[in-house]
Amino acid sequence: MEAWDVIVLGDGPAALHAAAEAAKSGASTLMMSSTGLGAPGMAALDGLSASLQEANNRSHREDTIRCGAFLCDQDLVAETTAGAIKQVDLLERRGLNFRRDQQGLPIVRKGAGHQQPRTTDAGSATATGLQQIGEEQCMRHGVIRRGDQVPLTLVHTKQSVDGLVALDMVNGRIIGLQCKALIIADEGFEGAFHTGVVGLGMDMAFRAGVGLRDMEFITHHPLTVKGTNVFLPTGLMLDGATLHEASGAAIETDGRSMLDITASISAAVQPVLDARNMGQSAAWWGSLFRLVQQRTGIDMNRQTLPLEPAVGHTIGGLPVDGNGRCVVVRGPGGSPVFTPQATQPARGFTVPLRSAVTVCWTR
């Protein structure tokens, strides 16, 4: 039986950076993904939000709390927004090519739900850039990565994780893996609503006795290509793309939150996205335009694109504390009592470098 210090489930930025940090600290680390490596499903990533041109993070913190309907853990929001600038700087030094202004600083724009310009990106290369940087850090620190490994059962005794049983889809074998700590950082259950990836780590932990929380909270992504599972970043609208009815009537988006934009598109008879007048900014979205043309045959440089809102992210999941630990305390009669400070999905992050976005059982 293989024995590891840390096993990480997932293959997105949260999983990659958690694995890299564990290996950097000297732990033998294994990353496992139930799908092929390098496909975290982040095509709709709009960019990273940080108070780069503000005196402090107060406005960012308040915008995040307001858009979360005051249901967020405000201490965690304050901590995350305060450290956002440092994380953007770290990504830049590691090679992420942000778009820049005339002063050489990353360009910030006013994204949906923000009162101030603070969203920076690299166009359609944002998601792939984050993935590549995470993979480079894993290679640098010696993390072993395996794809097509389906987690089946969590092995635990006396509320301590001992390892897991997984199905090796490459060789068709059932394997047992021993570990001292397990980090669950894979997808949510978005695939239950449309064709896509479903995170199996959450299901495995649930069957082991960990109750899930806030599963009723689901976000709908407004810019989904009708009849497909292709999600378009709302950053397109910051570069000049506009929303219309097929008849030409404009759908207002300025200063509105993502919920309001989604509601407007849902109420429209035949909403379309017009990206034909993006000018020089269209060059930053070249790979996205090619993807849409391959999937639908529509050239976004010449044609409008039909839209329909779809479930983009699931917010609920395993209950964790401020450090991302899944804490389970047994109450009277052996029933589980959870004492978390927050509930976060494995990939629900503003800046995707904090290991706190993962769920970790330790012994």
Task: Place the predicted regions along the sequence by residue.
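N-terminal Rossmann-like FAD-binding beta1-loop-alpha1 element of flavoenzymes
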Residues: 6-31
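Short hydrophobic core segments
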Residues: 7-9, 176-187, 337-338
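Glycine-rich FAD pyrophosphate-binding loop
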Residues: 24-45
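Glycine-rich active-site loop/strand segments that organize a redox cofactor
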Residues: 49-80
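Conserved redox-cofactor binding core of oxidoreductases
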Residues: 92-173, 178-181, 185, 221-228, ...
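A glycine-rich dinucleotide-binding beta-alpha-beta segment and adjacent secondary-structure elements
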Residues: 147-148, 152-160, 166-167, 287-345
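A conserved FAD-binding loop/helix module that cradles the flavin
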Residues: 190-204, 208, 335, 341-363
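An anion/pyrophosphate-binding glycine-rich loop and adjacent beta-alpha core
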Residues: 204, 210-311, 360-363
